[in-house]
Each structure stands twice: as structure tokens, then as C-alpha cells.
């Protein structure tokens, strides 16, 4: 199991608060480290969906309702909640954006990356704001690890953080081989 780098605390100040993202309102209902985070998303035109993200990062959808154009939907294992507004245009939000904003706060970069490469793992410690270039670079790095037989999801976050750091990529063989070998031997 992954190590927790920070102590999670309940955030009662978030409960009842909301923010707008891509014309979708996200309202937090409960934030508790033992039970996860619960929130609902609404498009302002009658479409709403309840979401719970458990401490292990998995999600459950509940309470989907909607008007003619407002009904939200999620694509199977997709982490994207999609809404149609009154004009029939798609609007949506990624679940990991709502989770990161709840536990850490607003992010200043355009993307949120899943450090271990598993897009359904929405634990806040697995999420990190990145630029588009960083996001693409990290995806290539994780593909390379998998090709060598190393599962990034099994690496502790401290090893993964070092491996994904931009300075490690200048010469990844010499920088990271020691840590990866130690982890794989244990």
C-alpha cells in the first residue's frame, strides 16, 4: 500500500462550499478522511449528480437526475462527469479536479496528473498540478516503466516523486536505477 505523506484532517469549512469549473457547480457535502469526500455537481439547468470518492481513490455515483437537457452521465470507468447545458452543449468536470480542490485548494496549472498513472485512483496524495508538457512527459515515463516490468502503482510515492522529477530525466538511468532496484528486490 502507498505511504501517506500528509495527515488528512476533516475539513468542515468546505462542507456546503462550492466552486464553478467549466460552468459546472461543485458543492461539497462532506469531507472526512475515514469515509472519503462527498460532493454533487450541478449544471444549473436541472442536471445533478452525487459523487463519493472513497479513501482508496475509487468513486461511486449516486443520485443522477436531470431535466431534458440537464441529465449528466459518466462514461463507464471514465473519471469525467458530463453535462449538457440548456443549449445542448457538453460541459463537464473531472472528478480528480474536485478532489484536489477539496483537499489541497485551487490549482495554478492547467492539468492535474495522477502520479501513478492510474486515472481511477483519485486519492489526493496521488494528484499533482502539472503543465501540458509535464503531463505528456510523465505519461511517457510511466509507459517506459511498465515496459520494463515495473508497475508504477506499486512504487511508494517518495520513489515515484523522485523518478518523475524533471532533474531525474536528464539521466534517469544513473539517478533512479538504485531506488528502483531496491524497491523491486524488496
Model regions: which residues?
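Conserved recognition-core residues within compact binding domains
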Residues: 1-111, 118-175, 179, 183
Amino acid at each position: 500500500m502507498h505511504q501517506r505523506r500528509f495527515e488528512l484532517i476533516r475539513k468542515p469549512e468546505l462542507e456546503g462550499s462550492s466552486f464553478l469549473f467549466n460552468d459546472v457547480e461543485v458543492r461539497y457535502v462532506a469531507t472526512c478522511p475515514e469515509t472519503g469526500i462527498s460532493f454533487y455537481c450541478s449544471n444549473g439547468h436541472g442536471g445533478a449528480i452525487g459523487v463519493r470518492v472513497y479513501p482508496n481513490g475509487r468513486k461511486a455515483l449516486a443520485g443522477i437526475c436531470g431535466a431534458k437537457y440537464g441529465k449528466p452521465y459518466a462514461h463507464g470507468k471514465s473519471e469525467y462527469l458530463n453535462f449538457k447545458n440548456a443549449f445542448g452543449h457538453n460541459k463537464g468536470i473531472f472528478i480528480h479536479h474536485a478532489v484536489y480542490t477539496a483537499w489541497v485548494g485551487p490549482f495554478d496549472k492547467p492539468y492535474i496528473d495522477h502520479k501513478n498513472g492510474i486515472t481511477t485512483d483519485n486519492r489526493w496524495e496521488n494528484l499533482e498540478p502539472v503543465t501540458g508538457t509535464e503531463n505528456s512527459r510523465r505519461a511517457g515515463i510511466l509507459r517506459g516503466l511498465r515496459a520494463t516490468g515495473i508497475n508504477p502503482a506499486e512504487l511508494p510515492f517518495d520513489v515515484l516523486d523522485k523518478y518523475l522529477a524533471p532533474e531525474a530525466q536528464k539521466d534517469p538511468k544513473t539517478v533512479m536505477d538504485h531506488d528502483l532496484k531496491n524497491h523491486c528486490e524488496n
